[in-house]
């Protein structure tokens, strides 16, 4: 749905979550996680060896770019009484976001294809990383970022109450995939136990948070600028940034102030520094205004 709280701080990006630290706003979960890992190195969940870091990065891309999430969406139980299909405003909004309209007929037609692709994903985890009976992907004592990056679409399908019966039981069950089902259950248990140890978050409304972000006097993070970039962008140029996979209409405009191979930062009209990953995001020069 439209994001008035994000519009309030000059961010046209539509996806959530985002993270704000002072006057810095970080978009996309992958960038948020890497930023938190850098800020709190003593509490990191990152793998300890270069090879395992590489495996974790591959999982980070696999669940999104590898089609796992796309095929999980095809399995949404559209037939339920409280299904998203009953909300016309939501359907209209998602059509703008994703470029296609969700219908019962279309959802039903897509289920066999979604199930077939997900069976491949279930098979992969069951017969490789989890095959030896380990608790976690990298055989760690606790879940690592590799587990977080790998598990979330499976957790959504298997434990979210709104996704109940999304997976046909004859193809997806604990007898056929005992190790994967046990892994997801372990992760959910660990997640719930960790939540119990944390203080209860203080929920604030969007206007309050927007004002806090805009009014903060904390100096924004400094990101270097790669002048020798492949696009020939110059520091200080006006640009627009948008996702390149879906949600391309959610553009965020501003002045280009930071650029590396992995990250781009703009200063928007509210004076906020908005950070995006380079992967799956497009940078375009802002249209020049004609002079009369």
Predicted features along the sequence, with ranges:
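Non-transmembrane alpha-helical segments in soluble domains
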Residues: 33, 37, 57-60, 122, ...
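GST-like domain detector, emphasizing the conserved glutathione-binding G-site
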Residues: 1-94, 104, 233, 240-243, ...
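Catalytic cores of secreted or luminal carbohydrate-active enzymes
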Residues: 169-226
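GST-like fold's C-terminal all-alpha helical module
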Residues: 66-182, 189
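Solvent-exposed, charged interface segments at domain starts and junctions
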Residues: 1-13, 166-185, 189, 247, ...
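Acidic, Ser/Thr-rich low-complexity intrinsically disordered segments
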Residues: 207-251, 255
């Amino acid at each position: 749905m439209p994001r008035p709280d994000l519009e309030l701080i000059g961010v046209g990006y539509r996806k959530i979550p985002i993270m704000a630290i002072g006057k810095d706003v970080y978009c996309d979960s992958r960038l948020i996680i890497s930023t938190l890992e850098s800020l709190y190195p003593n509490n990191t969940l990152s793998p300890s060896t270069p090879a395992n870091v590489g495996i974790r990065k591959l999982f980070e891309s696999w669940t999104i770019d590898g089609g796992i999430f796309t095929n999980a969406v095809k399995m949404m139980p559209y037939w339920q009484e409280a299904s998203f299909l009953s909300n016309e405003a939501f359907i209209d909004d998602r059509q703008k976001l994703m470029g296609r309209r969700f219908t019962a007929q279309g959802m039903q037609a897509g289920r066999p294809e979604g199930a077939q692709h997900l069976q491949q994903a279930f098979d992969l985890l069951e017969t490789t990383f989890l095959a030896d009976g380990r608790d976690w992907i990298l055989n760690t004592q606790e879940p690592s970022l590799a587990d977080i990056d790998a598990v979330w679409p499976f957790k959504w399908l298997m434990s979210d109450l709104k996704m109940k019966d999304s997976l046909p039981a004859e193809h997806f069950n604990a007898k056929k995939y005992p190790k994967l089902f046990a892994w997801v259950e372990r992760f959910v248990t660990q997640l719930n136990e960790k939540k119990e140890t944390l203080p209860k978050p203080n929920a604030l409304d969007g206007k309050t948070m927007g004002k806090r972000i805009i009014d903060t006097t904390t100096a924004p993070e400094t990101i270097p600028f790669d002048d020798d970039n492949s696009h020939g962008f110059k520091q200080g140029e006006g640009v627009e940034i948008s996702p390149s996979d879906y949600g391309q209409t959610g553009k965020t405009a501003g002045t280009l102030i930071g650029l590396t191979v992995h990250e781009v930062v703009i200063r928007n009209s509210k004076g906020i520094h908005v950070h995006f990953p380079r992967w799956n995001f497009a940078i375009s020069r802002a249209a020049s205004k004609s002079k009369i």
